[in-house]
Amino acid sequence: MRYQLTPIYCRPWLLNGLSQRLIESHYENNYGGALRRLNSITQQLESLDFAATPGYVLNGLKRDELIALNSTLLHELYFASLGGEGRDPKPFADVLARDFGSLDRWKSEFVAMGNALAGGSGWVLLVYVPRDRRLINQYAADHSQTLAGGIPILALDMYEHAYHIDFGANAVAYVDAFMRNIDWSGVRSRYDDAARVEPPRPLLQKEFDDIPGVSPEEVKAMLDAGKPVQIIDARPKHYFSRTQDIMAGAVWRDPERVQDWVGELSRSDPVVVFCVYGFHVGCQTAGALREAGLDAVYTKGGHSAWKAIGGPTQLHA
């Protein structure tokens, strides 16, 4: 067998409001069933002649493998999430407050998401996202829906098998019982491990490392805050003449004639330059302005990125 069973972590007889019978049934039948199904699928895949296997057969097996593997992993996290006293996680409250505004707001959203799945099925997951170095509450309608790149650290199983033995259709009472049994020390340990995972490496234009750039979100934040900033559209003339829109508040200037218009700019306010995609033209224009003594930066991703975030544009003459 390729995948080994993980012994149950929590002590079923000590849980508050969740019966030993419920936990045993859930662990043995649903978690165990997922693991057995996963190993059966794995065995089938290992024996396949991929070159001779019809595409629909391979697709079906890989789909079933994804569902069974995620079900196995999420159930292991679910049982690892139980066994505590469910008290407010003082050592972890600062992290939840940082990412959700407050501990109460995190709890309110997590519980509401569980209650919203009552009568249906799915998962509510507390997930760490290395890309943004933050936690989010994730909804999953089934075992195949998990956040790409996310690391789950707490799992609430909202499939009926997780509560019907004790609670029948009263999923709200089940969610309350789950919250009373969270092992926060385990959640914190998993968070600490997840937080050590580095975010994806940014793709850098190394030839422009010496020129500072800002994201379109940072540009929008400056404008929304009313900060004085000079926005220069430096898209090449031949490109600009074929387009209709320009970033709201920007003025177009020919990037090939910087010396002709640099004197128009205020030396007391920062300058943000953008071209089409944030490559050579924008960077070189920002570099020329910096050489002239201006506080200039280029916009990462250029005009295309500005439109992608929904930044306001207007028609140009």
Positions of predicted regions on the chain:
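ADP-ribose/adenylate-binding Rossmann-like module
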Residues: 233
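Feature for soluble, non-membrane regions of globular proteins
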Residues: 1-202
